[in-house]
Amino acid sequence: MIQKNWQELIKPNKVDFITHGSRAHATVVAEPLERGFGLTLGNALRRVLLSSLRGAAVTAVQIDGVLHEFSSIPGVREDVTDIVLNIKEIAIRMEGEGPKRMVVRKEGPGVVTAGDIQTVGDVEILNPEHAICTLDEGAEICMEFTVNTGKGYVPADRNRAEDAPIGLIPVDSLYSPVRKVSYKIENTREGQVLDYDKLTLNIETNGSVTGEDAVAYAARILQDQLSIFVNFEEPQKEAPQEQVAELAFNPALLKKVDELELSVRSANCLKNDNIVYIGDLIQKTEAEMLRTPNFGRKSLNEIKEVLASMGLHLGMEIPAWPPENIEDLAKRYEDQY
């Protein structure tokens, strides 16, 4: 009864991921959804996508000859404030955890771009064409960047360490790899019902993560956060018991002859004649058994006595023997004989 609260709600029978020629843009379409669930899920996913996914960003910069962000640099057209604003827009992918250091050195004339930055092994600049500043003839600039990982938006004053050296300028850090998210809700049909929701999410990232992966991470975050509110255990479905097909012969015939507690001589004779199962044995006649090397009348009588105690005898005919899956059948029926 309880599980009907969620089991009988309709769930999307398909989720389409549409790329637009790059990692940075994607459209996600999910349908059908219960009426109102498009807005519920769309709004929740959008908020998590924008605020809660981890990424990498520049947290501070140190420029040779500059003591604070209100300085100007000879031969550089932009002042330090504008340079810092441009640094904030550098898109970075970093595999490991920070902090890491990056350096750029360049002489003018020319434009200093993000592609001029010398990165370490697990740091990648995703928008190398992004302009940082412009140098005049004879001008030179050297900057060292601190890169770290985090989530959301962290203002510059929180990136300022108490023991920061003079000249280290903190930078506002936008860690989120997701730049824009929008969604729309449309009507869709399922069978004869016309008032279900269709959710379309449009996602733009900085390229460090695909739109499809970003949605997957956001959904996982929501799943983890909501699980704490579930205060009951779901009833377990009983697995249907496997139906064992009836055999065309006595299951005791699947027992191996080495379990019959025969004398060593008799057991060795059967082994040498490739008689493995009782079903193999009882199909033999007395004459066939006596033709077995080293098999005498004493061994024959011993075997006849053991078989008689099981209601069996030599020379029996068994339909459908040996079965193709004899080893599997022997394991399945071993508790029944």
UniProtKB/Swiss-Prot annotation:
Record's catalysed reaction(s): RNA(n) + a ribonucleoside 5'-triphosphate = RNA(n+1) + diphosphate
EC number of the protein: 2.7.7.6
SMART domains according to UniProt: RPOLD
GO molecular function: DNA binding; DNA-directed RNA polymerase activity; protein dimerization activity
Pfam families registered for this protein in UniProt: RNA_pol_A_bac (PF01000), RNA_pol_A_CTD (PF03118), RNA_pol_L (PF01193)
Record-linked InterPro entries: DNA-dir_RNA_pol_insert, DNA-dir_RNA_pol_RpoA/D/Rpb3, DNA-dir_RpoA, RBP11-like, RNAP_asu_C, RNApol_insert_sf
Annotated spans, Alpha C-terminal domain (alpha-CTD): 249-337
Keywords: DNA-directed RNA polymerase, Nucleotidyltransferase, Transcription, Transferase
Subunit record text: Homodimer. The RNAP catalytic core consists of 2 alpha, 1 beta, 1 beta' and 1 omega subunit. When a sigma factor is associated with the core the holoenzyme is formed, which can initiate transcription.
Domain writeup: The N-terminal domain is essential for RNAP assembly and basal transcription, whereas the C-terminal domain is involved in interaction with transcriptional regulators and with upstream promoter elements.
Role: DNA-dependent RNA polymerase catalyzes the transcription of DNA into RNA using the four ribonucleoside triphosphates as substrates.
Family: Belongs to the RNA polymerase alpha chain family.
Name of the molecule in the record: DNA-directed RNA polymerase subunit alpha
Gene designation: rpoA
